[in-house]
Swiss-Prot record:
Entry protein name: Probable histone H2A.3
Intervals of motif SPKK motif: 148-151
Organism: Medicago truncatula
Keyword Nucleus: yes
Species classification: Eukaryota, Viridiplantae, Streptophyta, Embryophyta, Tracheophyta
Main location: nucleus
Recorded domain comment: Contains one SPKK motif which may interact with the minor groove of A/T-rich DNA sites. Phosphorylation of this motif may regulate DNA binding. This motif is reiterated in both termini of histone H1 and in the N-terminus of sea urchin histones H2B, but its presence in the C-terminus seems to be unique to plant H2A.
Keywords: Chromosome, DNA-binding, Nucleosome core, Nucleus
CDD domains: HFD_H2A (cd00074)
Basic residues bias locations: 7-25
UniProt subcellular location: Nucleus; Chromosome
Positions of region (Disordered): 1-25, 129-152
Length: 152
């Protein structure tokens, strides 16, 4: 056979040329994930965590990472809304993580840059409630002499 009778096109990637190319379906799309399964698989192989990496491992890891990211972002978005802000900043991330029991335990040893600290006042330092109880539950009225109350 001479070169003129070949039907394969150059750059066809090892497949027979001619027809329209089928749209590629990534493993992330197959798994219904936003996180990149292929990239995570590459990192697992390149990192030499094990001699061999199964086909399901990067899918599972991508799903776990996506879930954790969604959880943290949801709580941080709520913290931003509580502070009347539209943009999530590191402070909101810190408040979200530290106020959630399970995430706080997971990220106990993690320092979030520019996150600040949780607001916390020791109960001993707070004013005592017994002062108010001695007056019968009512605050003493203080009126200034010479001033009449405002009329509506």
């Amino acid at each position: 056979m001479d070169a003129s009778t070949k039907t394969t096109k150059k750059g066809a990637g090892g497949r027979k040329g001619g027809g329209p190319r089928k749209k590629s379906v990534t493993r992330s799309i197959r798994a219904g994930l936003q996180f990149p399964v292929g990239r995570i698989g590459r990192y697992l192989k390149k990192g030499r965590y094990a001699q061999r990496v199964g086909t399901g491992a990067p899918v599972y890891l991508a799903a776990v990472l996506e879930y954790l990211a969604a959880e943290v972002l949801e709580l941080a978005g709520n913290a931003a809304r509580d502070n009347k802000k539209n943009r999530i900043i590191p402070r909101h991330l810190l408040l979200a993580v530290r106020n959630d029991e399970e995430l706080g335990k997971l990220l106990a040893g993690v320092t979030i840059a520019h996150g600040g600290v949780l607001p916390n006042i020791n109960p001993i330092l707070l004013p005592k409630k017994t002062e108010r109880a001695n007056t019968g539950g009512k605050e003493p009225k203080t009126t200034k002499a010479g001033k009449s109350p405002k009329k509506a």
